[in-house]
């Protein structure tokens, strides 16, 4: 029995590959992190087969590299993700996100009375790890929410 091992998503010469994103989360990452606000080519693989996860999403962004802060902010959505730096078609760096102390400019406060909705301020949440959850505390209204509530917002 032979297997054709072909790439399901075309390789990139230079840029970033975010792999092992939970299925159905890839589009949310593109939107929240404004990854599509570029003129560089972006390749997206959705519901790809994965030995570890069953199904996964994948994002490849040519000629673009994520900052350490951006990589760590992924931990809220895709804690098991792998972020690969690609140069000349080779992986030259590999990292996994770790939960940051603060997430800025990405999330929206679920408190409709929060001043962040009426004023031109950048969102900012303190991240607190709990036993079975992650809590996010808004810098402006100082209310604390389960990360599931903020992510659904």
From Swiss-Prot:
Q: Which domain of life is it from?
A: Bacteria
Instruction: Report the co-factor binding details.
Output: Binds 1 zinc ion per subunit.
UniProt keyword annotation of Metal-binding present: yes
GO CC entries: aspartate carbamoyltransferase complex
| Required cofactor names | Zn(2+)
Q: Which Pfam families match?
A: PyrI (PF01948), PyrI_C (PF02748)
Any one biological process term the GO annotation gives: 'de novo' pyrimidine nucleobase biosynthetic process
Any GO MF annotation of the entry: metal ion binding
The residues listed in the UniProt record as binding Zn(2+), with positions renumbered to this chain, are 109, 114, 138, 141
HAMAP family per the UniProt record, alphabetical: Asp_carb_tr_reg
Family, according to the entry, reads as follows:
Belongs to the PyrI family.
Against PANTHER family, the record matches this protein to: ASPARTATE CARBAMOYLTRANSFERASE REGULATORY CHAIN (PTHR35805:SF1)
NCBIfam families assigned = ATCase_reg
**Subunit structure and binding partners:** Contains catalytic and regulatory chains.
What does the function comment of this entry state? Involved in allosteric regulation of aspartate carbamoyltransferase.
Which protein, by its recorded name, is this?
Answer: Aspartate carbamoyltransferase regulatory chain
Q: Which organism is it from?
A: Salmonella dublin (strain CT_02021853)
């Amino acid at each position: 029995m032979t297997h054709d091992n072909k790439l399901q998503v075309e390789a990139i010469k230079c840029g970033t590959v975010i792999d092992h994103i939970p299925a159905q989360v890839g589009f949310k990452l593109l939107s929240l992190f404004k990854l599509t606000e570029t003129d560089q080519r972006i390749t997206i693989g959705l519901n790809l087969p994965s030995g570890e996860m069953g199904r996964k999403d994948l994002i490849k962004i040519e000629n673009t590299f994520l900052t350490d802060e951006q990589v760590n902010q992924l931990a809220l959505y895709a804690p098991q993700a792998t972020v690969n730096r690609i140069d000349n078609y080779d992986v030259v760096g590999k990292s996994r996100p770790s939960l940051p102390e603060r997430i800025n400019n990405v999330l929206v406060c679920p408190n409709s009375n929060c001043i962040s909705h009426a004023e031109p301020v950048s969102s900012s949440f303190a991240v607190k790890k709990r036993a079975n959850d992650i809590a996010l505390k808004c810098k402006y209204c100082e209310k604390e929410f389960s990360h599931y509530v903020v992510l659904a917002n």
